[in-house]
């Protein structure tokens, strides 16, 4: 593969990954608690690129590549719903839910009372109380949640929502749309100065207009790279034809 085609093909692959990411962000612009993803590029320092340099291969064949995706954890707008099962956090921290594979962390506070009487997410995951146990409620009765996270029924406390902060958000990996898994060995602590707000939800932090503008720009870049590949292919054919004529 000639250097021009290699560079363009690498760029097209990176743009394809970016397009997928942007499309997913736009699709989740209306998903409560969703955190937008972005990408960072490894342009020059990948091991493959350096190997190519030392072996006199075109480094462009390995560049640019999407090195990793990262998540924007900035807070979304808090929106009033008035619904008993909707809960938002005023500041940092995450709700903790229990799954078969272990705890997950989320900013999405769409909760309900399940058939077994436990407080759970819309996906059926148990919402954990401080200490890690599920919160059991009477499905026939309403419940309240104080700003400190205390869940009560009939004016009697039944548990406190577990709201934790992590030492660094780099230790969180997205698992599904609005859930995150904590890296082994990462540290957590009770979220400080964070209020639990019943009857509110946190909107997605995706900026749809900004994402759409960026998507159009990436599409144009992709089309330009496609054109470069086509031109390189035509140049290659012409070169072969000229050699054949000389021969």
Model-identified regions with their sequence ranges:
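Amphipathic alpha-helical polymerization modules
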Residues: 1-247
């Amino acid at each position: 593969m000639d250097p021009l085609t290699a560079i363009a093909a690498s760029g097209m692959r990176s743009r394809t990954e970016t397009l997928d990411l942007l499309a997913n962000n736009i699709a989740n612009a209306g998903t409560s608690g969703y955190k937008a993803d972005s990408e960072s590029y490894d342009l020059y320092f990948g091991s493959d690129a350096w190997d190519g340099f030392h072996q006199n291969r075109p480094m462009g064949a390995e560049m640019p590549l999407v090195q990793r995706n990262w998540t924007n954890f900035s807070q979304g707008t808090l929106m009033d719903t008035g619904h008993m099962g909707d809960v938002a956090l005023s500041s940092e921290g995450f709700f903790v839910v229990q799954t078969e594979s272990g705890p997950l962390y989320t900013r999405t506070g769409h909760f309900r009372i399940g058939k077994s009487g436990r407080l759970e997410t819309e996906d059926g995951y148990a919402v954990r109380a401080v200490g890690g146990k599920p919160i059991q409620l009477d499905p026939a009765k309403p419940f309240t949640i104080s700003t400190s996270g205390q869940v009560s029924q009939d004016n009697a406390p039944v548990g406190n929502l577990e709201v934790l902060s992590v030492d660094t958000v780099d230790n969180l990996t997205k698992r599904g749309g609005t859930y995150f898994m904590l890296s082994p060995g990462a540290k957590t602590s009770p979220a400080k100065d964070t209020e639990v707000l019943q009857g509110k939800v946190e909107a997605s932090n995706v900026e749809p207009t900004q994402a759409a503008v960026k998507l159009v720009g990436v599409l144009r870049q992709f089309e330009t790279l496609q054109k470069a590949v086509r031109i390189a292919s035509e140049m290659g054919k012409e070169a072969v034809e000229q050699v054949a004529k000389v021969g």
